């Protein structure tokens, strides 16, 4: 008998009892109710031991932008095991079950926030998103910003925020497509201040969510669509100099704020954030928006030890800018083409790392001409994930 069972709302109390223990937090009655409402969109599986939940995994149906195209993904969350059942392979089996479900439901990609990067690498996930953390002395932002327009504090306006966010998110690979429920449940926290910047034609160019407490200006979300909008928001932050001594914010890894300010020597750290995994390699390759090249022909050898049906040799070919993928259903023998694991394939196709970088580190290998071809085929776009689950 399969010990993995899909759980229902009747199991919510036991589900969140395990979550609170495993992740060491305590929910009030109101917070528990909110968690249960959020869980209504989840598919939750439990590894059952005599009708009790020994381990569990949540899967959230989401979609993201990759090179301007929308991809359905499965977000893995709240993976937990009671201590007396740990190290029995329950999480491994739950992950395998979730990957099979995702493939059957057209979710060709999966995200998760790891408690341990090495643990999830064993099952095919790879770091695909970094965060750059800034701690900026307020004094560093007090300069003439040369802006046109204004910033206005605002109450919640999901329609406006969503319009701005969507245009911003499409500039990156892997950013979430948010629906109204996600905005309400996951983004718009109670007590957060909000402001929108407008150009001199009264067109919205960005927004900021923030808190000011204990002499610190904490940016919760910082979104802009133009250089003018960026500067308007920076000037808005600087105008809080009587209330805060420093500013904390998280930005994309390629953020260029240090080039804009007179004194760029402030604390900047880059930290690995979310991991990703291609669930269905042949399907993902077939729908991935490669760059259009006049003529291309190459072989891609993929190894996936956890989902063996992904392993094989794929022919990437194209004429007149149309790229096609053929699954040759062969093993990984032969030296021609490029050889990689599913982890590094995910890293490359999301744009987190370039093929040339990985080849230099011997994380992928192949003949020089093939590496050069795949380098040209994969669009260059920064990865960024502003959400959490």
Sequence positions of predicted segments:
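Active-site/acyl-donor-binding loops of N-acyltransferases
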Residues: 126-143, 221-228, 235-337, 342-344, ...
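Conserved acetyl-CoA pyrophosphate-binding loop and the N-cap/start of the following alpha-helix
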Residues: 85-97, 228-232
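Short amphipathic alpha-helix that is part of the acyltransferase structural core
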Residues: 1-61, 68-75, 141-180, 213-217
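Short loop/turn motifs at secondary-structure junctions and domain boundaries
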Residues: 35-41, 186-190, 347-349
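Amide-forming acyltransferase catalytic core, primarily the GNAT-like/NAT-type
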Residues: 131-220, 224-240, 282-294, 298
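Conserved active-site tyrosine of GNAT-family acetyltransferases
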Residues: 120, 125
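Conserved GNAT acetyl-CoA-binding A-motif
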Residues: 95, 100-114, 242-252
């Amino acid at each position: 008998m399969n010990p993995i069972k899909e759980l229902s709302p009747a199991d919510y109390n036991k589900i969140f009892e395990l979550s609170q223990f495993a992740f060491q937090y305590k929910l009030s009655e109101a917070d528990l109710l909110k968690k249960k409402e959020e869980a209504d969109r989840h598919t939750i599986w439990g590894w059952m031991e005599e009708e009790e939940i020994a381990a569990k995994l949540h899967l959230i149906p989401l979609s993201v932008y990759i090179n301007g195209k929308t991809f359905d993904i499965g977000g893995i969350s709240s993976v937990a095991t009671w201590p007396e059942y740990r190290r029995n392979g329950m999480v491994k089996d739950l992950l395998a079950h979730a990957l099979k479900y995702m493939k059957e439901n057209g979710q060709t990609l999966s995200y998760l926030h790891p408690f341990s990067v090495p643990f999830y690498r064993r099952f095919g996930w790879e770091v695909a998103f970094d965060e750059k953390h800034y701690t900026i002395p307020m004094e560093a932002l007090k300069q003439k910003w040369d802006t046109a327009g204004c910033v206005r504090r605002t109450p919640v306006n999901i329609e406006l925020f969503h319009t701005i966010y969507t245009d911003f998110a499409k500039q990156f690979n892997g950013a979430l497509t948010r629906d109204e429920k996600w905005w309400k449940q996951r983004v718009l926290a109670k007590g957060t201040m909000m402001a929108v910047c407008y150009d001199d034609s009264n067109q919205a160019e960005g927004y900021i969510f923030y808190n000011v407490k204990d002499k610190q200006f904490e940016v919760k979300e910082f979104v802009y669509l133009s250089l003018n909008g960026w500067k308007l928001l920076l000037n808005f932050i600087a105008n809080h100099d009587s209330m805060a001594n420093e500013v904390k914010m998280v930005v994309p890894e390629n953020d260029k704020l240090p080039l804009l300010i007179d004194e760029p020597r402030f604390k900047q750290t880059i930290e690995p954030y979310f991991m990703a995994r291609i669930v269905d390699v042949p399907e993902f390759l077939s729908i991935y928006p490669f760059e259009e090249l006049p003529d291309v022909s190459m072989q891609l050898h993929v190894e996936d030890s956890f989902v063996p049906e992904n392993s094989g040799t794929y022919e990437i070919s194209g004429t007149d800018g149309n790229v096609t993928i053929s699954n040759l259903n062969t093993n990984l023998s032969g030296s021609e083409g490029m050889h990689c694991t599913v982890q590094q394939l995910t890293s490359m196709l999301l744009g987190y790392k370039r093929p040339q970088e990985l080849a230099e580190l011997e994380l992928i290998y192949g003949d020089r001409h093939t590496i050069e071809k795949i380098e040209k085929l994969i669009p260059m776009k920064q990865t960024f994930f502003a959400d959490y689950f």
